[in-house]
Amino acid sequence: VEHPDAEDFNNAAALPTDPTWFKHAVFYEVLVRAFFDANADGAGDLRGLLGRLDYLQWLGIDCIWLPPFYDSPLRDGGYDIRDFYKVLPEFGTVEDFVDLLNAAHERGIRVITDLVMNHTSDSHPWFQESRHDPDGPYGDYYVWSDTAEKYTDARIIFIDTEESNWTFDPVRKQFYWHRFFSHQPDLNYDNPAVQEAMIDVLRFWLELGIDGFRLDAVPYLFEREGTNCENLPETHAFLKRVRKVIDDEFPGRVLLAEANQWPADVVEYFGDATTGGDECHMAFHFPLMPRIFMAVRRESRFPISEILAQTPEIPDMAQWGIFLRNHDELTLEMVTDEERDYMYSEYAKDPRMKANVGIRRRLAPLLDNDRNQIELFTALLLSLPGSPVLYYGDEIGMGDVIWLGDRDGVRTPMQWTPDRNAGFSKANPGRLYLPPSQDSVYGYQAVNVEAQRDTSTSLLNFTRTMLAVRRRHEAFAIGTFEELGGSNPSVLAFVRQVSEDGDTVLCVNNLSRFPQPIELNLQQWSGCTPIELTGQVEFPRIGHLPYLLTLPGHGFYWFQLTGCEEDA
């Protein structure tokens, strides 16, 4: 099976090497298919995304994260890859992708994408060769067995659709292993040739100029009898190999782990802390997200406090990625059964809103389109420890279309204008890959970029302002996190501080729908003056007594603590 080399293409100009850019970055997840359709065929494409980079630069994001855009039969949203070296034809070509990289880099925006390392599509030439020629060069590229009785301790991830992790292949007359759908056979990482082949894929895109990868489904690369086949030492050893390739050949590029596990397990994916981390630079903090929703619904800071207290220290060169919503369902794997029932009853009253172990909604409808709550959630996302990941459309409060199947309800076209097709495409409306929302509250006539850009008080302009404030204060990106407790359980207060005398930010969040008072012990900052960051208003100087603040329902404050030398 032949594949092209990066030398066959013009490679993109790289941004200056900055080994810590990801710690300061705000990420924006955008589905190529959903953003903008440049060739009027009804689906978004790479040229369309390129034409909308000015909007993303105006909004103030630092890095675009693209889910897979590789050639695929699209039975799992592109996570079933048929050719790692080709772009899905409806999105464009590899040349289009290089043009996108160049245009993004000119605007100071980086681009990362998903790389699915665990499995391929069953239509990938490697798998077809493996089925038809067991003794050939690809015979050992996948995990084959004469029996389906191996690795019985591994859970089934897609409980809605799959009965077993083994599927019988009538051609080879053996079973093949798959942790996800049966049309996604797992690669066999015990075969050194597979490891080399996947490192070649990484090199190809890195040489073209991509800024990094989110490694999809990393815990499952290896299988061992008597284990649950997740987080195995062999998997970590392979990730160290991948990181070494990055460090040696492509410094400044980033690996982001997608490991939907508890924080104590995820920390392992940063690697050896004594070296500052020698595996992935970043990992998503999955359990934090449902607990932000629980804390606000219960009007109590404890769900957030507890999960942050259970989150171990991470290596110096590592960073969490945090998010409120993304292209999947709001995952509830990382909560207890009781908490899951609570979340379903509060946030998914219609059974069509459920998917696998989670809730299939966008941010605004999850929060009943309550502007105060949306602003509070945005403030938490931008101030809690980690690099925030925004999901396209949430900055304008897009809704979901729950009658679309599977996860498509949260993957509808970006709403640019009140015109036909939401300004997303000039195609005949019947040709669109999915219909834009026509809802009376969330439809594109009511919710769109054009209207919100022109309205100073819009959610879009609020989000842009908050991103600008965050960029001015590196405490949000790299500061330590210290929770302050306080007299009122409905209020979450914390300090982010770069160093003893560095940038210091105090964040106070009212998780209740009613106004709340809070008395905070700020003695160690006595003599400082809090300056509110959105309006630059000075608040009373901090003394030795408890500091009283009152907050409106779902209100929040971001303060910079200044002038601390002149101790009271």
What name fits each language-model region?
Residues 1-568:
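Active-site and adjacent substrate-binding regions of carbohydrate-active enzymes
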